[in-house]
Amino acid sequence: MDLPKAYDPKSVEPKWAEKWAKNPFVANPKSGKPPFVIFMPPPNVTGSLHMGHALDNSLQDALIRYKRMRGFEAVWLPGTDHAGIATQVVVERLLLKEGKTRHDLGREKFLERVWQWKEESGGTILKQLKRLGASADWSREAFTMDEKRSRAVRYAFSRYYHEGLAYRAPRLVNWCPRCETTLSDLEVETEPTPGKLYTLRYEVEGGGFIEIATVRPETVFADQAIAVHPEDERYRHLLGKRARIPLTEVWIPILADPAVEKDFGTGALKVTPAHDPLDYEIGERHGLKPVSVINLEGRMEGERVPEALRGLDRFEARRKAVELFREAGHLVKEEDYTIALATCSRCGTPIEYAIFPQWWLRMRPLAEEVLKGLRRGDIAFVPERWKKVNMDWLENVKDWNISRQLWWGHQIPAWYCEDCQAVNVPRPERYLEDPTSCEACGSPRLKRDEDVFDTWFSSALWPLSTLGWPEETEDLKAFYPGDVLVTGYDILFLWVSRMEVSGYHFMGERPFKTVLLHGLVLDEKGQKMSKSKGNVIDPLEMVERYGADALRFALIYLATGGQDIRLDLRWLEMARNFANKLYNAARFVLLSREGFQAKEDTPTLADRFMRSRLSRGVEEITALYEALDLAQAAREVYELVWSEFCDWYLEAAKPALKAGNAHTLRTLEEVLAVLLKLLHPMMPFLTSELYQALTGKEELALEAWPEPGGRDEEAERAFEALKQAVTAVRALKAEAGLPPAQEVRVYLEGETAPVEENLEVFRFLSRADLLPERPAKALVKAMPRVTARMPLEGLLDVEEWRRRQEKRLKELLALAERSQRKLASPGFREKAPKEVVEAEEARLKENLEQAERIREALSQIG
């Protein structure tokens, strides 16, 4: 046997990771096997592995390995995303260290630098995924800006444009002054933030004033109206009049609009169409022309802006404007207020709003194609609740702003004629050809749009482009649609819904059959991990400390029902201990072979039990994999390996092995081989190593998934009675304070035949012998099928034992009383953190239960 005494993941995992990277599991579209396809959510090319990636890819790899073993042509398509904003920001930071900006280099040279950076550093995250054991088809690795994916993007846009679904129009958009680009609503994060609410007084035409409340006093100078609710009697007499913007000579109308909230502030709303989405909608309804006073750099500008504020940053301008309003008597009050601060999800900068031409995609007709499919039940969701969430979003979807003011990304294939201003987009049949003259007037003076597509535009094509679309490739014919998409619920709208749109529109069918949505990985307190909080758990550090198998297994084990995961390091310790337990069990089996001399070949009760229990386990675990309930599958495997195999069968097999029973050794080997197969999708490294040592076969990943054998319910029932008898004896020893190895004598009642027929195994497991008659005084432990009675005479000083128990009982009751007093205090429950209160409740429960057990034991001895 060549397994070292102790398991060291560092000596095993890199070896297998390198082997799988060099010899990837390449799919064959002509194999004739039924396909099973997963599209890997492409991580950002800028990225390093974080816990979300680790969870996401552990689940995918478990599924792909399972299906590969089930005989499917399992295809896991990997790749990375060019991550427009994120990548551009990374490279711009590198340039800043050289004292340069992208504008110093110019677009062409800057893009050369980005590609250079991508080639040098962009493969980091895929290398890290390989270290985690990801068995993707690395021969099909894709990048959202490689040649094939670029062709798909150009073709998709050409189709959308010539079908009237892509159009260019000026609208209010989210703008990040730091990243210098527009953002979709889904790329904006809103957080409650302490701020101020200012009440300002506007002079009304003909005398009097009207007061408005705002959190953005610096935008007052862009006001185009004051709106009140049509049913608000307080302002009915002012409708149709005008009000003067403070510190200016600009007069604006007072009008009625149902969007105004009567109960917010004063009930009168300043309408600033250029700087607020709601105001923009009100302005559209009333024909108000937007006026902007904040430029794209976030600075104040415009004729309406007082000289003292021009050129100031918007936040500095806010402070200064409030001073000016106060001095001029326009500030009525200033109060603390929690504002909903909208920030860029990439850099955290508070966004601004701006109006300028952008490319848009008409989502309503596209969403309707998807909704028809979802109503037919084309796509299953796990958990099912997300289907309604997906449909609700599609039913209320707005047009998608698909252009970004970046340099890194897919440059939009649209050209503007400098003579007649016509837009030129290549037609689908010539989508790769750049136009040389204007389709409208024939002029050769064409200028290409400088904007790039939103990163999610190319990501939305992922299930198609990874298979070679728009070319009619063998992969596309064989592997579309995909089977399961595994991703986090946080990108359901950003990515999943948009892939549905692409699939139904371009292929006429769903892009995948099932969507498995998992939660976020949070810290042990349920908080999001962030560098600023200092609570980030680095998966690579965890791999170094516990092993990749342990990390994978812990994450899968915790991924129940799509809920967020609170990751406590104790779960990683649990998984590492599980790996060690399995390793030691395998060493025992291999050691048992050495020098074994067969003297008999008879199935024991334990052998029959283990084979039957394994058969049930195979059936249950297979069903859980099929239902995509990997967390429960992990728990079932854990129970089967740790409890049934290691704790019970392995121990019960020792007397038979000692007696030279070949059937028992064969059962150990065969059961272990099946357990390694069941666990392989979740813990591929350790199981591959042990399977090779056990069977001599090179690649467990290519072995067949086990089929359930026959059930032996009689053996399962009999062995369960034996287990209960042993458990009862062990509990009695613990109750009496005796060491587990202490030899005792017990009297059994109930289903005792299995014990009597397997007395040697019972004695070995319990270190107990049977009494022929029921003792008068004894500690009693009742189990569902067996009751055990253990007299204390001759084992210990009964009176001394009684004194110790009574003393402990008093201590426990005192502790329980202290907890009850603390929990009864309103101050404690109101002020103490929730986890502190829960811990105190758990202490009280445990102490009361222990006290009850001691009372019962004392009453039994008399």
From Swiss-Prot:
Gene name tied to this protein: valS
Principal subcellular localisation of the protein: cytoplasm
Entry binding sites for AMP: H50, H53, T487, G488, D490, H518, V521, M529
Entry note about domains: ValRS has two distinct active sites: one for aminoacylation and one for editing. The misactivated threonine is translocated from the active site to the editing site. The C-terminal coiled-coil domain is crucial for aminoacylation activity.
Protein name in UniProt: Valine--tRNA ligase
Cofactor binding mode and count: Binds 2 Zn(2+) ions per subunit.
Binding positions for L-valine per the UniProt entry: P42, N44, D81
Result when mutating F264A: Decrease in posttransfer editing activity. No change in aminoacylation activity
